[in-house]
Amino acid sequence: MKAFHLLLFDGSLIFPECILIFGLILLLMIDSTSDQKDISWFYFISSTSLVMSITALLFRWREEPMIAFSGNLQTNNFNEIFQFLILLCSTLCIPLSVEYIECTEMAITEFLLFILTTTLGGMFLCGANDLITIFVALECFSLCSYLLSGYTKKDVRSNEATTKYLLMGGASSSILVHGFSWLYGSSGGEIELQEIVNGLINTQMYNSPGILIALLFITVGIGFKLSPAPSHQWTPDVYEGSPTPVVAFLSVTSKVAASASATRIFDIPFYFSSNEWHLLLEILAILSMILGNLIAITQTSMKRMLAYSSIGQIGYVIIGIIVGDSNGGYASMITYMLFYISMNLGTFACIVSFGLRTGTDNIRDYAGLYTKDPYLALSLALCLLSLGGLPPLAGFFGKLHLFWCGWQAGLYFLVSIGLLTSVVSIYYYLKIIKLLMTGRNQEITPHVRNYRRSPFRSNNSIEFSMIVCVIASTIPGISMNPIIEIAQDTLF
């Protein structure tokens, strides 16, 4: 009876995750038992599961931090806000994908199952409190990501991207586990994050070469999920070859989940090696901001350009991880990631809509879009300007707060690189916007000349995601203070 009550108590701490599990089971049951599948029901079940999970998470807000399942999971505000961000990404990505799936005639059930399972893995990864749970949750997230990227099995580019993603992902997981083994051995056989710190103190191994080896391997393993340079090789190919809604989903959820995990791993087990991991992350941030933004200038594909742009963006996020909670670094990182979700998903919603009408992804083919679809052109322009960090859009205030926290922490060189590369990013975003707004007939491509808008009824779902993301991307600076205050409340 005591064990039952303990299980019931621990289960209540993962109630948002249980809602998603119930939604997964319901989808599987309907798909396997019903001959005539009503697609709208599948969307309704998956979207309702995500919204209910968000609601359950918000009801648990400000509760005392708790450890569940014998130390495997921890619930606190810091973990929960990352879980909220992952759920928000998934909720916005489902309506963004509806029209694409219908037009490409992909299997809807499997797509939604993979989305929900990836979300579930990301949520468990955010709350994981020991090395084994971190690895299992990460693999749950990763395996479903591989399946999503190769969802269009008949597409050669998708198959190529999935193969690269799978091989490099498997290698990075092996490297991560090797780093965990060094951490496990150095701490005297501990796997819980806080107990590892105590174990390192007891064994006097907190400044040993073994810890530095563990730090190096774990940084490489987590770096693959964050995709900073030089761990970025998979990103452009996967972005270009995968279905666009999948790219939109993975581009934000992978970074949110990996950032949550990286923050806890670096901040707790490597507490005594803060100088070393700060140096490692500074190198990654500098390489990411410079290489990502410079290579993005040369791209001709919108999705490849956004891939390199995301590499630069993760460099900005790493600044917040380095600063930590002493100077508001975590709060600024969370705030910027919230804005990044809206900016990035809004951009991808526009790309999905344009791609379905024209069948092209080439940047040159966007020339003159404003003359045919001013709403889509303006939405894309606003999201790109926000990604570039132009005032008074949300991206500007997010970057401003992030850079200010880095400057206060003494990261002058890192912030200077961030400012310079932000100017570079504005250049290639403005180059696209100039193409969108051109009105000269000789520059308008045949794709735009033959552009057709589908009836509102068939694309209202993607327009819903687009409107939400565009509004969130253009939030004025007056909204920054309450958002930052909420983010600061999450610090552990």
From Swiss-Prot:
Belongs to the complex I subunit 2 family. This is NAD(P)H-quinone oxidoreductase subunit 2 A, chloroplastic. GO terms for biological process: ATP synthesis coupled electron transport; photosynthesis, light reaction. The chain crosses the membrane at residues 6-26, 39-59, 81-101, 106-126, 131-151, 165-185, 209-229, 277-297, 305-325, 336-356, 377-397, 400-420, 464-484. It is found in: Plastid, Chloroplast thylakoid membrane. The keyword Transmembrane helix applies. Its EC number is 7.1.1.-. One of its GO terms (molecular function) is quinone binding. Pfam families: Ndh2_N, Proton_antipo_M. It is a multi-pass membrane protein. HAMAP family: NDH1_NuoN_1. NDH shuttles electrons from NAD(P)H:plastoquinone, via FMN and iron-sulfur (Fe-S) centers, to quinones in the photosynthetic chain and possibly in a chloroplast respiratory chain. The immediate electron acceptor for the enzyme in this species is believed to be plastoquinone. Couples the redox reaction to proton translocation, and thus conserves the redox energy in a proton gradient. It catalyses: a plastoquinone + NADH + (n+1) H(+)(in) = a plastoquinol + NAD(+) + n H(+)(out); a plastoquinone + NADPH + (n+1) H(+)(in) = a plastoquinol + NADP(+) + n H(+)(out). Keywords: Chloroplast, Membrane, NAD, NADP, Plastid, Plastoquinone, Quinone, Thylakoid, Translocase, Transmembrane, Transmembrane helix, Transport. It comes from the Eukaryota. GO terms for cellular component: chloroplast thylakoid membrane. NDH is composed of at least 16 different subunits, 5 of which are encoded in the nucleus.
